[in-house]
Amino acid sequence: MLEKLIERVLFATRWLLAPLCIAMSLVLVVLGYVFMKELWHMLSHLDTISETDLVLSALGLVDLLFMAGLVLMVLLASYESFVSKLDKVDASEITWLKHTDFNALKLKVSLSIVAISAIFLLKRYMSLEDVLSSIPKDTPLSHNPIFWQVVIHLVFVCSALLAAVTNNIAFSQNKGH
C-alpha cells in the first residue's frame, strides 16, 4: 500500500514540468519579439545598409530562428515525453514528435547547437577585420577570442558526432536483441 502511494506521488510529480514548459513558451515570445525588432531594424535601414551588415543581420535572424526552433523542439518533446500526450486539435500534427525518443532529441539538440555555433562563427568571420584590429599583434593565441570560439565550436561538433556514434552503436546493439 505504501509502495503504491509512493509510486503514485512520484508519477504525479511529472506535472511539475508543466509550468516549466509554459515558461519556456514565454522564451519563444521573447525570441519572436527580438526577431521582429531585428527584422524591423534591417528593413528600416534597407537603403543605407551595407552588404556585410545585411548578411550579418540575416545571419542574426537565422540564428534567432534556429534558437526558437530548438526551444520549441525541446518544449514539445519534453511535454510529450514526461508530462502528457499532446491532444491534437486538428490533423496537422507534428510528425517528428511521434518518432522522437530521448536519444533522437539529444541528437537534434546537439545538431542545432552546432548549427547555432556555426552561424555565430560565420558572423564573427564577417567582421573579422574589426575583431583582429582590436587585438594587439603580439597577443598569444590563447588570448585570441576567435581561437576560443573555434575551439568551443569544435567541441560542439565532436560532442554531436560522439552522440551520433554512441546512439548508432546503441541502436544497432538493441536491434539484434
From Swiss-Prot:
One short Pfam family name for this protein?
A: UPF0114
Q: Which UniProt keywords apply?
A: Cell membrane, Membrane, Transmembrane, Transmembrane helix
Any single GO CC term annotated in Swiss-Prot or TrEMBL for this entry:
plasma membrane
Record field: transmembrane: 15-35, 54-74, 102-122, 145-165
Membrane topology annotation: Multi-pass membrane protein
**Where is this protein localized, as stated in its record?**
Cell membrane
For this UniProt entry, what is the primary localization, expressed as one broad class? Answer: membrane
The cross-references to InterPro entries, in alphabetical order and at most eight, read: UPF0114, UPF0114_bac
**Protein family according to the UniProt entry:** Belongs to the UPF0114 family.
- Known NCBIfam families for this protein? HI0507 (TIGR00645)
Official protein name in the record: UPF0114 protein HPG27_173
